[in-house]
Amino acid sequence: MSTAIDELQAIIAELKTELEEQKTSTRIARERIERMSAEVVDSNPYSRLMALQRMNIVKDYERIRDKAVAIVGVGGVGSVTADMLTRCGIGKLILFDYDKVELANMNRLFFTPDQAGLSKVEAAARTLSFINPDVVIETHNYNITTVENFDKFLTTISESGLQKGQPVDLVLSCVDNFEARMAINAACNENNLNWFESGVSENAVSGHIQFIRPGETACFACAPPLVVAENIDERTLKREGVCAASLPTTMGITAGLLVQNALKYLLNFGEVSDYLGYNALNDFFPKMTLKPNAECDDRYCLQRQKEFQARPQPKEQQIDEVVSNEPLHASNDWGIELVAEDAPVEQQTTNTTNVASGLRLAYEAPDKVDVNQSESAAVVNAGLPETSLDDLMAQMKSM
């Protein structure tokens, strides 16, 4: 009996060792690429991205490798966001989450059943490194809303850019609760970092993204999007024991809008939306810009507002219009003449006895024509003698 137990324990120990090896091993599908190339070959993962330069959409796409982005929340929206940025060749991704992958997450995109039980940041880092080994992946497995961890989060986003000691270029919020959004808002206001807030509604049929520039646009404490759009208190949305709905379609669309605007900001092309919503029921995409609240509860937001107001505002360029006296069209086949607005209008001479006072005819009516006279005139013009109708009938019968 003891021998069988020892054998089982040995098998269990062997399986544990194998499992740990699988957890720590990272698959590398290809060698790292030092420089992006626009060469159109099957082995170049960046050829389709670099084509944006050839089509004059982006001036220098390779600058994306100099950018560092922090993603807070690696769930339905955050994991897809990280996947898209990795495929786009971002320089560095910093992932924050403290949750684990569960089978209940499988209705969303990105994660697979064999990753159940792993921390989300660990599972994401393995998959992303396999997709694109050129991207630097940094993970942080803790809750940013606690006092101790908030300080670590604050330091990380302010000093963990690609250059040591430099802040990240952009922060993307993909969390699902009010407290985490407020923590990100406070950290970005304090560090004066631009960031995107994103979210999907509890019923899974609407989403939004909001680009927040401290001092210039409303921060999350100034006007939370759901409070503005639907008059809902966001603190009531995340409730214990209540299962929120989720659709991979809504998650994917929201993540796509988020990454699209992040790329436009990082690579300086197109127009970045300050607020962009999505309603899946009628495919409605509202846009708006929210001004900061002068009485915001966040003291760093008020400080950034003062700094923004003190900056010299760019002057609008006035374009001088060149006015030419020459006619726009030299030819005038139709004899059209331009008349000044103050030119006198010729009055019609038509009899207007039946027209009410203060009115005039729009055109001159033709004179009434006597049909009998016109017929007789036609006969004369035809050179025929004037003959009565009875004579004509008699002539026809005699023929």
Curated annotation (Swiss-Prot):
Q: Which cysteines are joined by disulfide bonds?
A: none
Q: Which GO terms describe its biological process?
A: neuromuscular process; protein ufmylation
Annotated binding of Zn(2+), by residue: 219, 222, 296, 301
An example Pfam family from this entry, by short name, is ThiF
Sites where the protein binds ATP: 76, 97, 120, 143, 177
Q: Which GO terms describe its cellular component?
A: cytosol
**Keyword terms, alphabetized:** ATP-binding, Metal-binding, Nucleotide-binding, Ubl conjugation pathway, Zinc
Q: Does the keyword Zinc-finger apply?
A: no
tRNA-binding among keywords: no
Which InterPro entries does UniProt cross-reference here?
A: D-isomer_DH_CS1, ThiF/MoeB/HesA, ThiF_NAD_FAD-bd, Ubiquitin-activating_enz
Domain of life (superkingdom): Eukaryota
Catalytic center residues: 243
Provide the GO MF annotations for this entry.
Answer: ATP binding; metal ion binding; UFM1 activating enzyme activity
Write out the similarity annotation.
Answer: Belongs to the ubiquitin-activating E1 family. UBA5 subfamily.
What does the UniProt record say this protein does?
Answer: E1-like enzyme which activates UFM1.
The name on file for this protein is Ubiquitin-like modifier-activating enzyme 5
Q: Which organism is it from?
A: Drosophila mojavensis (Fruit fly)
